[in-house]
Amino acid sequence: MKKQQRFIYLHLLGICFLGMQANAQQVGFTTENDAYLLKLEDDYYTNGIFLHLSYADQSKKNTKRVHRFELGQQIFTPLKRNTRTPADIDRPYAGYTYIQYTRSWFNNEKAVVQLTGTLGIIGPASGGEGLQNTYHRWLKYAPFLGWRYQISNQLVLNTGVLYAHNLIATKKFKWMGWGAAQLGTAFINASVGTKMVYGLFNINQSSQLWNAAVEKKGMPKKEFFIYWNPKITAQGYNATISGGSKTAADSAVTLH
């Protein structure tokens, strides 16, 4: 678990954003992998790829709204790749592919509200095993040996909500508190956290911090900042760990 914690810490503390030219629409691609930290082995969350499209509009009350569509895939594996038996698996094998819609409201410079809806699949149908084997072959990495024990196919229907509010805001520093929750067939959880931002940043409704650097008119100022986003999560259910309703009847390995 120490390796997993180190990855999360570096991910949260080390991210920065550069200013981008803004338009009414924005297309982006994000990739996450422990190999970017020059490591030769995978941790529990081994890979993520995300393609997203965002656009902005204004409501009748002149509130900015940002609509975001995301197509993503995440891959989870045990810590050790030479796990050949269920007894060796300390984290279930799981692939997760989904499409997600997020609507964000910015009704003033202090508050952010987000609602999300997600449709996806966990299990062999997600294509996680094939993708990992492909890029491991390209990069000359050893394959993981226990994919036959991966989580069974499960349909994902999830919804989520997030609310954030500025606590302190100066020209170069911002401190925000936030709370979020997910409910559905694959993930049930609640989180509280804080975002501490330092650098050159725009107000929330024009900041890449909230994927809001899209404008129907005009263009926001450039941004360059770092942020820290610690959080506490109460986990009710995670299908990439506990599996779906059919898992108990097949050869998949789950943790409860």
Which residues make up each language-model segment?
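N-terminal ordered "arm"
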Residues: 25-61
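Residues on the lipid-exposed face of transmembrane beta-strands in outer-membrane beta-barrel proteins
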Residues: 49-55, 71, 99-103, 119-121, ...
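Residues that define the transmembrane beta-barrel architecture of outer-membrane proteins
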Residues: 43-49, 65, 93-97, 113, ...
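Short loop/turn motifs that connect adjacent beta-strands in outer-membrane beta-barrel proteins
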Residues: 23-25, 57-66, 107-114, 167-175, ...
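Outer membrane beta-barrel transmembrane domains
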Residues: 37, 79-82, 202-206, 210-256
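Long, hydrophobic/aromatic-enriched structural stretches that serve as scaffold segments
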Residues: 63-132
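Bacterial Sec-dependent N-terminal signal peptides
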Residues: 1-26
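Transmembrane beta-strands of outer-membrane beta-barrel pores
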Residues: 31-37, 73-79, 105, 121-127, ...
